[in-house]
Amino acid sequence: MLNAQINFTAKDQVPDYNGKFRFGVNPGYHGSDWGDEDLADIAAGEAGVGAFRASLPEFFLEQWGYDVEIDDFQHYQSVGMEDHVAFIGYPTDEHQEETFYCPNHQSELFSNMYLDIWDGGANGTPVNDENHYALYVYRMVTTYQDYVRFWEVWNEPDFDYSGNGYKDAGQPGNWFDNVPEPCDMSIRAPIFAYIRMLRISYEVIKSIDPDAYVAIGGLGFPSFLDLVMRHSDNPDEGQITDVYPDNGGAYFDVMSYHAYPHIDGSLREWNNDIGDFDYFRHSDAATDGILQKQIDFRTVLYNYGYNDQLYPAKKWIITEANIPGIAFDDEMGSEEAQRNFLIKTRVGCELNNILQLDLFQLARKKLPEDANSGFDAMGLFHRLSDIEPSGEELTSQGIASQTMTALLSDATYDAAATTALNLPANIGGAAYENSDGTYTFILWAKTTTDQSESVAGNYSMPASMNMTDLEKREWNFSQTGNFNIVFANEISLTGAPVFLRGIPVAVDISEQPLLSHTLDIFPNPSPDNFQLSIKGTTTANFQIEVINVFGVLIEQRKIVHNGSRVIHNFDCSSWAKGAYFVKVRSAEGLVVLKVVVD
């Protein structure tokens, strides 16, 4: 069956995301003893990973067959991994553009991309089979649409050989005010050709799976994003014409970026007084660096109207990020900082609507004594290539990941409860509601000292949350099984995040029966509305209050009951998911009923 061409762009719509936050990882290659299924087994089963950032290059699929990875993706699904990212592109030699846009460097992109994308089914597919990239995307997405949620177009197309990508507007050679030469970028082709890839990707992918997400590929520089946003795919300087009607922002749903705070300038600032840098090499500054990059990219997107006002806002994923477990030169790096960074960054992602964080990487490439850069000291596992499956060993970051996933596996980030924590400036954290109605709080004292994770802080749960005792678990709980009880008004914190679990006692559940009346709530649980039934033969005045688990009043009513059975409807479609208490009071007493909104 031929797919219909689409009649919309990302200027018109971006699909809602109804999945949960996923902690993913870049799996990498670790020798012939480790197949993709083996890596998935240890990633999901031991490190708590929920998704892979996979790669499906054309040269690989053409050589081995387009369905070569189906068994692997089915296995990922069987171990609980879903909503994967796949970065795409990378043509076969036969399909690589032959143009040399600069001496000694052939274009890395596909040939024939400027042929028509569609041919009305002339060759049995809806796309023009002579447009090599369009045909590759069509065949790939048709095969893997049930497994891949985010299609990331290329990997780091903005990788910069010129030294200009990082520059701010106004500086010589910057990309905000200038168009880079093709060979300044890793694609070795004009920026307009990359936008052409985005357009082909968007049109073809959306024709097959309108709810799939097209992501701009793992960017590091806001200036490259600005290039895409201000040009079309027109090879004539990116001008807008009838044939090339939109700039690049129309052809992707998701802003995907990469961030490595230890090398991107996040952790230092020039000080004229000392003629040197001030450094901030600690985990909170590293997490702040990750989130500052989101702000920088968002500023560009908003400048071009992608702000949910003129056009739909983009969704967000991070497909590479980490800091080293070993310090090199003046860079940040320690085991303690690395594991703290992971937990803090996961929390930061959820606080800022980032849908997925794909850590770099599953396992370290070298032993500590052989490492010669920070990237050699990143991973949830120690080096795998020297050992066979079953001999793997988690790093401390991997243990923290295992603990984090175990304690949050059935939990959902709760923005309202996080706000209710009223955290002071020196305390970081968030609230998560567990499926049983209890809460897990991740809290820590914010680090402030260069090259130190040592800090102390105290926090007391607000009285309105009605917490008494909490179970406190540390980053290595998945290995030790240890926890202790702390008072909710005397919580001592350090720079290492802790997991605190407790149930708020928002109301006195003791019921004083209303002897003349029978009360019932249905349906319960309820997705969008529930009904309160009051049955009795006598006249009575009722005061009804609905409160959440923190005692916050959600709705109140006064009802005069004149006998018989009366049904009162409550619209809960706008309420946050979770448990609520319906307090029904009359002259005879109080009844408290629990209802769950799901």
Describe these PLM feature segments.
Residues 513-598:
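C-terminal outer-membrane/trafficking sorting elements
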Residues 460-479:
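Solvent-exposed beta-hairpin/edge-strand motifs
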Residues 110-158, 163, 185-208, 224-254, ...:
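An active-site-proximal structural segment forming one wall of the substrate-binding cleft
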Residues 481-507, 578:
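C-terminal beta-strand-rich structural cap/linker in extracellular carbohydrate-active enzymes
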Residues 420-466:
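Carbohydrate-binding surface patches
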Residues 191-339, 352:
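Noncatalytic carbohydrate-binding groove/subsite architecture in carbohydrate-active enzymes
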Residues 5-141, 145, 152-153, 158-187, ...:
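N-terminal substrate-binding region of glycoside hydrolase catalytic domains
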Residues 325-402, 416-422:
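Aromatic/acidic polysaccharide-binding cleft in carbohydrate-active enzymes
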